[in-house]
């Protein structure tokens, strides 16, 4: 029987999920996105050629792999078409490989307008959203007024539903935020223009995945963002609007949770965060600049500079707990090359001197803590491009071993560069 594997980020996103998903899809028949939207940014480097995907699953570059956008993904038709056209220009037969759930909520222009207006109104308290309408689209979903992909296939009914929801949102835009209204006729025309094209790729995702499972075909579920951005378990309110954790697989694709075999947590060898929000181990010094520059820490979606810091074991333990992480993939180990010493956060100290080994449940709690750091010797040798453990310096091996001890979870994959082949798979999640 084939295995069903989840690949997800265990930090604040940007851990290197895209490369690992692309690598593992060699053994998968299906790759499924189950949450988020085009706020994700998954970078693939194959033989030096870089491809950045925001919405379409990272398996799209593989022959004989079906890529699925599940019902938990909020779908912007214009963003999808941009990505499809980019891939088709590169010779990728997208229509043969991509399938979409009719239950995906639609992101429409008024969602983006609302997102931007709200961030502007928050001023110094801005959350740091991508401004791509993700949050407002999820709001419409849970308030049961949202439009879904399947609604596009009845033009008359779609027009009525769109008019109702736009009347509500345009009122908010003009009267509360003092912004311009979004044009109804233009929104309707643009949405219906691609209805038939989308319909040709729609399917019952839950049924398809269940049949694939019964046939023993391996399925890979691709997470977006990271555990610490989860709407429920992240640094609320500085979070995304979906469940980025393993539990989101079942709700976001209709796949039975008992059929998941392995959860691979992607963990950078240090930590980064993009946008606002608490970050106990943040380095606002020359070491932080070194990590940011060497690690090319700029968001694949927004281009924003990421905030670097030491690896936070307290947060990682929470990620292991929430996701039932089977094993880790450690990425960007090579970025630590050249540092005299490396540090790991092993606890959070509060003003009264007590030390916690669990994370607060909201952003406010993080303001009170300072990281308790454990120092280890660094290494001067290069780990870049290493493809076997024997090529790693002893200090790097000691660092990896210490992480495994602290997390009580094995590191099964080590990534030492952006390309597919700059990876060592110690334990294959599909084996």
Curated annotation (Swiss-Prot):
List of catalytic residues: 14, 42
MF terms in GO: adenylosuccinate synthase activity; GTP binding; magnesium ion binding
Binding of GTP: at which residues?
13-19, 41-43, 306, 332-334, 415-417
Its GO biological process terms?
'de novo' AMP biosynthetic process; IMP metabolic process
The cross-references to SMART domains, in alphabetical order and at most eight, read: Adenylsucc_synt
Q: Which cofactor does it need?
A: Mg(2+)
**Binding-site list for substrate:** 300-306
For the protein in the UniProt heading, the enzyme class is: ligase
How is the cofactor bound, as the UniProt entry phrases it? Answer: Binds 1 Mg(2+) ion per subunit.
Keyword list (alphabetical) reads: Cytoplasm, GTP-binding, Ligase, Magnesium, Metal-binding, Nucleotide-binding, Purine biosynthesis
Report which superkingdom the organism of origin falls in.
Answer: Bacteria
Keyword Cytoplasm assigned to the entry: answer is yes
Give the coiled coil ranges.
none
Task: Kindly list the places in or outside the cell where this protein is found, as annotated in its UniProt entry.
Answer: Cytoplasm
Q: Please tell me where Mg(2+) binds in this chain.
A: 14, 41
The keyword Metal-binding is assigned to this record:
yes
- Provide the reaction this enzyme catalyses: IMP + L-aspartate + GTP = N(6)-(1,2-dicarboxyethyl)-AMP + GDP + phosphate + 2 H(+)
Q: Which residues bind IMP?
A: 14-17, 39-42, 130, 144, 225, 240, 304
Task: State its role.
Answer: Plays an important role in the de novo pathway of purine nucleotide biosynthesis. Catalyzes the first committed step in the biosynthesis of AMP from IMP.
Q: Per its record, how is this protein called by name?
A: Adenylosuccinate synthetase
Q: Which species is the source of this protein?
A: Shewanella pealeana (strain ATCC 700345 / ANG-SQ1)
């Amino acid at each position: 029987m084939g295995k069903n594997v989840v690949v997800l980020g265990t930090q604040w996103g940007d851990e290197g999920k895209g490369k690992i998903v692309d690598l593992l899809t060699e053994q998968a028949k299906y790759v499924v996105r189950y949450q988020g939207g085009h706020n994700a940014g998954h970078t693939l480097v194959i033989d030096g050629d870089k491809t950045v995907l925001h919405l379409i699953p990272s398996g799209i570059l593989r022959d004989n792999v079906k890529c699925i956008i599940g019902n938990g993904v909020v779908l912007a038709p214009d963003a999808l078409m941009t990505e499809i056209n980019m891939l088709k220009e590169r010779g990728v037969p997208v229509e043969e490989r991509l399938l979409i759930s009719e239950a995906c909520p639609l992101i429409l222009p008024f969602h983006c307008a609302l997102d931007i207006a709200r961030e502007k109104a928050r001023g110094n308290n801005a959350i740091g959203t991508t401004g791509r309408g993700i949050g407002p689209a999820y709001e419409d979903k849970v308030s049961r007024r949202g439009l879904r992909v399947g609604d596009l296939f009845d033009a008359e009914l779609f027009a009525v539903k769109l008019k109702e929801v736009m009347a509500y949102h345009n009122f908010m835009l003009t009267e509360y935020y003092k912004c311009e209204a979004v044009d109804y006729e233009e929104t309707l025309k643009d949405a219906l223009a691609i209805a038939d094209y989308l319909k040709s790729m729609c399917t019952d995702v839950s049924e398809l995945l269940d049949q694939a499972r019964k046939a023993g075909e391996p399925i890979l579920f691709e997470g977006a963002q990271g555990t610490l951005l989860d709407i429920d378990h992240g640094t609320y309110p500085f979070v995304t609007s979906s469940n980025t954790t393993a539990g989101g697989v079942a709700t976001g694709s209709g796949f039975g949770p008992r059929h998941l075999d392995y959860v691979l947590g992607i963990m950078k060898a240090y930590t980064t965060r993009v946008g606002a929000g608490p970050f106990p181990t943040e380095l606002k010094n020359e070491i932080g600049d070194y990590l940011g520059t060497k690690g090319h820490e700029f968001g694949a979606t927004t281009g924003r500079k990421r905030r670097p810091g030491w690896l936070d074991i307290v947060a990682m333990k929470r990620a292991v707990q929430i996701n039932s992480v089977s094993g880790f993939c450690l990425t960007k180990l090579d970025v630590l090359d050249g540092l005299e010493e490396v540090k790991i956060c092993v606890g959070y100290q509060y003003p009264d001197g007590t030390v916690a080994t669990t994370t607060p449940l909201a952003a406010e709690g993080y303001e009170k803590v300072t990281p308790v750091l454990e120092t280890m010797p660094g290494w001067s040798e290069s780990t870049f491009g290493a493809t076997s453990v024997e090529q790693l310096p002893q200090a790097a091996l000691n660092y990896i071993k210490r992480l495994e001890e602290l997390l009580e979870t094995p590191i099964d994959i080590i990534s030492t560069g952006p390309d597919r082949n700059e990876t060592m798979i110690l334990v294959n999640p599909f084996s």
